Amino acid sequence: MYKKSGQLYYSPTDLTSFMESPFASWMDRFSIEHADKAPGKDPADELMSALADKGYAQEELQQSAFIQQGKTLLSIKGASTDDKYQNTLDAMAKGFDVIVQAHLQLGQFAGYADFLVKVVHSDGDQPSLLGNWHYEVWDVKLANLVRPSFVVQLCSYSEMLASMQGVLPEFMAIVLGSGNKERLRTSEYYSYYKTLKSSFTDKQDAFRADLRPDPADSKSWGDWSGYAKQILLDRDHLFQIAGITIGQIKKLNRAGIETMQQLGESSLEHTSGLQPEVIKRLIAQAKIQRASGGRDVPLFEILSPPQGEITGLALLPPLSPLDVFFDIEGYPLDKGGLEYLWGNTYFDEAGNRQFIDFWAHDQEQEKQCFQDFIAWVYQRWQQDPSMHIYHYANYEIAACQKLMNRYGVCEHEVDQLLRNNVFVDLYKIVKGGLLLGEPRYSIKNVERLYRQKRGTEVASGGESIIVYERWRELHRLGEQGDTYQTSQILRDIRDYNIDDCDSTQELVDWLRLQQEKHVIPFFGKIDVSEPEVPEEITDRIRLRDRLLLRSLAEREKEPVKASLAENLAYCLEFHRRESKPIFWRLYDRRGQSHVELRDDLDCLAHCTRTEREAFKPTARARNLAYEYCFDATQEFKGAQKQFYLLGIETDSGQSAKVTFKSEESDLANGLIVLQSKDEPPSIISLVPDEYVNPNPIPQAIDQIVRGYEDGNLIYGQSAILDFLARAKPRITSHRDGPIAPSQDPDQRLQQITKAIANLDHSYLTIQGPP
């Protein structure tokens, strides 16, 4: 927002700021009205600047794409906003295909749209003020998913555009960082937008400098986060307690607890919406943080695992001389992200600490880097099955899973390492086994217990992104080499990564000392489990490999056939590959505590058996149903029919499962009915079984692919091969040109029907209604 000639003007970004943070929106207005009294904004964020530069580059790519499509473009220029507005109107009237950086305005709202794209009207469409065309707004974003703020901005631009052309565009579009284009129907979001805009303008009209919104009521603080945090710290606000959520703060507030001191001194045991063990943990956390204030080394307390649960230090495996301490440096500003440095601390045969690193500066190198890392750690695990790979938080595991899916490599090895719990997340161990007098449980906070402050040139993961971006720019100019031996910047990043890996190793040593001191045995997985691979799957893998070899052989002389063989080969593994993330998520959930599952909307924690007798839900039912009660304030989707019981196994060693009987349950009032072959325990937590059996689709794909390998499916004589090769449809007696050229709906339908009837072992794509 800004003032011009005493008049306030707003942008679509002001609306999204208000939507996400009433506090930040108020502060923006206050800084305009009372600049002399306003606190300083947050310092410029180098990462945000880098993201902005990437955004401009993304817009240029889209602009180039329009040019390659043969569209006429005009980029709006002008000495003033009034000039730019008039030039935009002139460009719209002249009918350019694409207008770049169009200046739009309506009343007190104004802004620049990345692109206005021309839409030519069909016969019978209502004309706009421009004639038989109008424009729709396209916005370019780096994100890979559509966010609510993007949609609000587009609606605002579309409303301004409607005032200029007389027609509200039917669609608006977002070009995402992945390259995908999302077209959104304006009418589906417009009512929400108008309501939001009305609330925003009402607040602006009623603005008072003495009525600042409480920063605690906003999830973010925009450019004023430093000021907001100081306000809350001055109030001793609950937000500073490690691990506390906004929902928990609100529930504690309703119980009369507003400050960290009040919570630390509280004897509260029960309040609506919070489990007693959660309250107990929050009180203990508040106490130890207050007691640690001003200390060089924070206080800590070791937590023994609750009865019947394997948490905290009980998850820390014994020492192996082949252990690896692992950390990745990632660069999220590339499309899809780039995991560019895989660092590992380990010990050689003489017991000396060593470091090995794998680097990648593009996707081809990333694939090789991933394969090299997995091959190295897998060989060490084969040599000693008691060896583990230690990392802090989930980033490293997520990266391995992402790259395995992206490149289709190392599937067996990653599966085996995950299945046998070779990766050990130290964050889970610390969070479950340690009470720490710090406001966060990041490794930078935890390492205050066992090492001195760092002295590396690169200070944080966020800073490493900026430093690596700087290296990429200098490397493009030929001023930096592409190895740490030829680049000081890469050497600094490597030093930071070594420090991270060494810190991870030192944390394991420190945790192991605490484990021994408090006599907490390891209860994790010891035996190596090999998956039973059905003969059907091994046959499929052999077929895949034969087709990939065939694709390589045909690549130069018959590229179409080579592409067909490659596509068919990867189709064979599609369903098995797609099921892996489901099982990984299941393993992750089954490794969590009852308390942790409470925050998962697909799970249901702490269900307690009611006094209702077990019963048969139907006269013909073979298994009994059991009623449980749970805290109705716990958010639960109830989307699955089958659930695993956390930590419970059957007599045969299988994970116990139950069936959710929705018709017998009353979730709104905290009652759920579960059907089971065996009687479940009196207290249970539910983990969803999200696997959907794809059969018989994989078998049908097998049949098609085997037919291709055996020569029964021939390119040029098969509809499915035509489709995979993107070949033009073969239609008997049809020459080149439109298949259904008529604009008359009835005649066009007849032409389409005739074309389908005359298909010659080919296909025809039909665009149906939305």
Each language-model region and where it sits:
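A contiguous, basic/glycine-rich beta-loop/short-helix subdomain that forms a polymer-engagement track
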Residues: I283-D323, I328-E329, F615
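Hydrophobic anchor at the beta1->P-loop junction of P-loop NTPases
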Residues: I766
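Metal-dependent nuclease catalytic cores that hydrolyze phosphodiester bonds in DNA/RNA
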Residues: M1-H121
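Acidic, Mg2+-coordinating catalytic module of metal-dependent nucleases/exonucleases
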Residues: F171-Q240, I246, A255, E438, ...
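Conserved DEDDh/DEDDy metal-dependent 3′-5′ exonuclease domain
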Residues: T81-D82, G95-L106, A110-H121, G131-D205, ...
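Compact, charge-rich alpha-helical regulatory domains located at protein termini
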Residues: G226-F300
